[in-house]
A protein has these predicted regions:
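Early transmembrane hairpin module of multi-pass membrane proteins
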Residues: 65, 71-72, 79, 143-144, ...
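Polytopic transmembrane helical bundles with strong interfacial aromatic enrichment
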Residues: 2-439
């Protein structure tokens, strides 16, 4: 949506009219930014040769070029759909007016925006964005499923009986076909749920369903073959998780920009902090974006290390060149994110500090007197960010069809153990080997690092506020995480793949030792004391933890009788 304010003049009259207003990115520019990904697909396809005619069996130009473009649309649509639901769950109030009187006053404004009941206009719009993106995601997943079979079989698209029979076998018997069929079903179910649910539990399970679709995506492609299968799959899963939260949230945010502008302008007219609304949304998203950026960068390095063995392969091979371009773009995105956190957000936060800010000790940033200019810089930066993200995802769609320099085939002299598990047999299971052999499981490593960093940060935050936190609880929680790291990345994990005794050590330690020390650390109590409480109707980490702790499911599974039956029954069922 284009701005309606007049351009500034030297006389300053127009400047006065626009003061306190906010600027929103026009939707055509958003479309242009997203189309950068299609351009990246075309350029990367030409550089890597994935669009060239096959030497043995050619599926046709429609499949050669349609498959990477469908994958790009799939990735963008999936990220936008899931990111929009996450944004609705953590950053946007579901209802207008905390009190019935305020709610009645806002009913008229809500109806003017096409919503029903007392649903907040921003919430209604972001869920509409999620619904449309989910439909596109489902259609794109179907396209990828059909085109991937056409590419694998080397047959052009057709309605012949032979193509249909082969496609049915592909979906039923081939891992890639099964994975993409699963994604199609999950995307369709997600699209149905996102159009129907509006309560807290519905948002939670819809978001979980969308994020679960990452699993089949991580299990196919380059990660499904080659060396160190577990590291490749887990690092790719973490990479996709970060991309969905980061790219999806930002794309949903910029598609929401016109509605944000309307709401912010209405608040500004009432002198209730319109620019501050923009700053609040951006600040909440930026926390998720920062965590996602770290996850994407580190998991990308791990995954690249499995595909590239030398600097020559990185700089000379088509696969390596594309990885280098992705890394450079990611650094650029990190720089833009730093500008948001250190420059834009503080100015928007101070935009509604008011004339008495100095007396209250609130120094207003230099540009906060002109929120129009600040919000324009904000959305222009986000447009550049979305274009870079789209280009990176476009390159990734082509990389999925490009052979890496490192061979993905097992060597001819591979041992039976390596053929079955992907790893050679470890040394004899001596006691020392259980503590000296290591094979990092990056999924667990990422979770452990996050929990450790959060716990220490929360404890320091409490101490700065003058609240003491027992050091014994901290040591207990960190010791439990250390045990968790050992059992998932140390000797028990290595021997657990080939020996039943190693597997039982891993199982029992996971269920009976590590949880005890972690529970003694009282992480939920620490979260309740350290996390801020929100009063604007949105649900932050504290509100979601409270909801989970007091949910019926939580009360059921924590009942001593149910917990005992679950523990004993799982052992009987599996062994």
């Amino acid at each position: 949506m284009t701005r309606t304010e007049k351009a500034p003049t030297r006389g300053g009259g127009a400047q006065k009219n626009r003061t306190g207003q906010v600027w929103a990115a026009p939707l055509p520019l958003v479309g242009a930014a997203l189309s950068a990904g299609l351009i990246a697909v075309a350029v990367a396809g030409w550089l890597t040769g994935v669009g060239e005619v096959g030497e043995i069996a050619d599926p046709g130009a429609v499949t050669r070029w349609g498959l990477p473009m469908s994958r790009y649309i799939h990735h963008i649509a999936m990220a936008t759909a899931v990111g929009a639901v996450i944004l609705a769950a953590v950053a946007i109030p579901a209802r207008v007016g905390p009190r019935s009187r305020q709610r009645r006053r806002d009913q008229k404004a809500v109806r003017e925006h096409g919503t029903t009941g007392d649903e907040h206009p921003l919430f209604a719009r972001v869920m509409q964005i999620a619904a449309v993106a989910a439909v596109v995601w489902t259609i794109a997943a179907i396209a990828v499923l059909v085109l991937s079979y056409s590419s694998l079989a080397g047959q052009p698209l057709s309605t012949s009986e032979g193509f249909s029979t082969g496609f049915l076998g592909y979906v039923q018997s081939i891992a890639t076909g099964q994975a993409w069929m699963t994604i199609v079903v999950m995307a369709g179910l997600f699209a149905t749920l996102v159009s129907a649910v509006r309560n807290q539990a519905g948002l939670f399970f819809t978001a979980v369903l969308g994020l679960t679709a990452i699993v089949p995506m991580a299990l196919v492609g380059h990660s499904a073959s080659g060396d160190d299968h577990m590291a490749a799959v887990n690092s790719l899963g973490l990479h996709l998780l970060g991309v969905v939260i980061w790219v999806g949230g930002l794309t949903a945010l910029i598609l929401l920009a016109p509605e944000i502008r309307r709401q912010a302008s209405a608040l500004t007219a009432k002198d209730q902090g319109g620019p501050e609304l923009v700053g609040t949304l951006l600040r909440r998203y930026s926390v998720l974006a920062m965590l996602a950026l770290i996850t994407v960068a580190l998991s990308g390095i791990i995954n690249a290390d499995l595909r590239i063995e030398s600097l020559r392969q990185l700089l000379a091979s088509p696969y390596g060149v594309m990885l280098t371009l992705k890394a450079a773009a990611t650094l650029g995105l990190a720089a833009i994110g730093w500008m948001h956190r250190s420059w834009i957000i503080p100015r928007l936060a101070g935009a509604h500090a008011g004339p008495g800010a100095s007396a209250r000790g609130l120094e207003k940033p230099a540009l906060s007197a002109d929120p129009w200019r600040t919000t324009r810089m904000l959305w222009q930066l986000i447009l550049v960010e979305v274009a870079l993200m789209a280009a990176v995802i476009g390159v990734s769609a082509v990389l999925g069809r490009t052979s890496p320099p490192v061979s993905e085939e097992l060597p001819p002299d591979a041992t039976p153990a390596r053929t079955l598990t992907g790893y050679d047999l470890p040394p004899a299971p001596e006691l020392a080997n259980y503590f000296t052999l290591w094979r990092p499981d990056w999924l667990w490593v990422g979770l452990i690092v996050f929990l450790s960093a959060w716990y220490i940060t929360a404890m320091i935050s409490l101490r700065r506020r003058g609240t003491r936190w027992p050091i014994a609880r901290t040591l207990s929680f960190l010791f439990g995480l250390a045990i968790l790291f050992w059992v998932t990345s140390g000797g028990p994990a290595i021997y657990g793949m080939v020996l039943f005794s190693g597997h039982m050590i891993q199982h029992m330690t996971l269920t009976m030792v590590a949880p005890i020390f972690m529970v003694l650390g009282s992480p939920v109590t620490l979260a309740m004391k350290s996390l801020p409480t929100r009063s604007d109707g949105t649900r932050g980490a504290r509100e979601w933890i409270l909801w989970l702790v007091h949910s019926r499911f939580s009360r059921l599974v924590t009942n001593p009788l149910v917990a005992a039956a679950n523990f004993a029954g799982s052992i009987l069922l599996f062994y």
